[in-house]
Amino acid sequence: MRVDLFDFELPEAAIALRPASPRDASRLLVVRPGDPLADRGVRDLPALLSPGDALVFNDTRVIPARLSGIRHRAGGSGQRCEAMLHLREAPDRWRAFARPAKRLAPGDRIRFGSEGASEVCALSGLDATVEERGEGGEILLRFDLSGPALDEAIAGLGALPLPPYIAGKRPTDAQDTTDYQTVYAREPGAVAAPTAGLHFSDALLAGIDAAGIERVHVTLHVGAGTFLPVKADDTEAHRMHAEIGILDAATAARLNAVRARGNRVVAVGTTALRLLESAADPDGTIRPFSGATDIFITPGYRFRAVDALVTNFHLPRSTLFMLVSAFAGLDTMRAAYAHAIQSGYRFYSYGDASLLFPEGAPVSESIT
């Protein structure tokens, strides 16, 4: 499918640089194919769903995955570099996107330290060896530390990995450490936030409980590949980077019971949706899942496990806009995004939200 079909004009001013405050004050656009668009608020979500429905949250926790350091090579001078960790392959190995990747080669040693430091003492530094250099700036790093010791070093020396469209406009600050983390995050490992979840405050979660809506947690450690642009002209030529997900047997049983009684499984974010679809059989039965998924969803995909989706507003030509177009229909989403832009909705990670229903979904009294 041609990538330019997913292009649209997005004013730069529409990209939010800060989230709404409080976090549940964001706007919510309800999109049901065939029905008028409805301008609501995130706080309306409990009233827009039915008792017995299940909201599925991704409980991954963002780690400070952006590391700055100095490359050292025998007979050469030091070279500043940056690595954005995106996939852990072993207790001491991470795949990362490096800058400048062309200046790195297998065998190079890198001393990572505090942001912008040119000299780092042995006690505060983190050493790694470049084992591979791949395409698109990707490298494989083998660290001298392993397991929890490596986790502790990354937590102490790394910086929060804000998305490029935000980080390019302003520096990361202390407020981002709270803003760019869901209130229910508990499983460290993501290098990008599951941003649809950023809208949920403790008060909103309490309202969801009071409305009789189930809350279910799964884990997908979001990788930096979510920030990568689609450079191919056709979706068939684009390769998704793998991400690690976990959905246990008890969770699978709960979700299957929700659908068996006629209620809906509502994914909070594209990351939760991708994990659910990766775990589902062709008949929609959700199975336990533990491992990597590189599922790439474009129009024509038949959804198996998800009945509605809460998600932010995504960038043009992105894999995420392709996914929502597959879910609700390309024409529907192009019209919804045109309305959102004209109505001043805020886009991207810190922006507003939408509640999407799939093509062919029956009209619900709670939405009309």
Swiss-Prot record:
InterPro entries: QueA (IPR003699), QueA_dom1 (IPR042118), QueA_dom2 (IPR042119), QueA_sf (IPR036100). One of its GO terms (biological process) is queuosine biosynthetic process. The keyword Cytoplasm applies. SUPFAM superfamilies: QueA-like. It catalyses: 7-aminomethyl-7-carbaguanosine(34) in tRNA + S-adenosyl-L-methionine = epoxyqueuosine(34) in tRNA + adenine + L-methionine + 2 H(+). Keywords: Cytoplasm, Queuosine biosynthesis, S-adenosyl-L-methionine, Transferase. It is found in: Cytoplasm. The keyword Transport does not apply. One of its GO terms (cellular component) is cytoplasm. GO terms for molecular function: S-adenosylmethionine:tRNA ribosyltransferase-isomerase activity. Pathway: tRNA modification; tRNA-queuosine biosynthesis. It comes from the Bacteria. Its EC number is 2.4.99.17. Monomer. PANTHER family: S-ADENOSYLMETHIONINE:TRNA RIBOSYLTRANSFERASE-ISOMERASE (PTHR30307:SF0). Belongs to the QueA family. Transfers and isomerizes the ribose moiety from AdoMet to the 7-aminomethyl group of 7-deazaguanine (preQ1-tRNA) to give epoxyqueuosine (oQ-tRNA). HAMAP family: QueA (MF_00113). This is S-adenosylmethionine:tRNA ribosyltransferase-isomerase. It comes from Methylorubrum extorquens (strain PA1) (Methylobacterium extorquens).
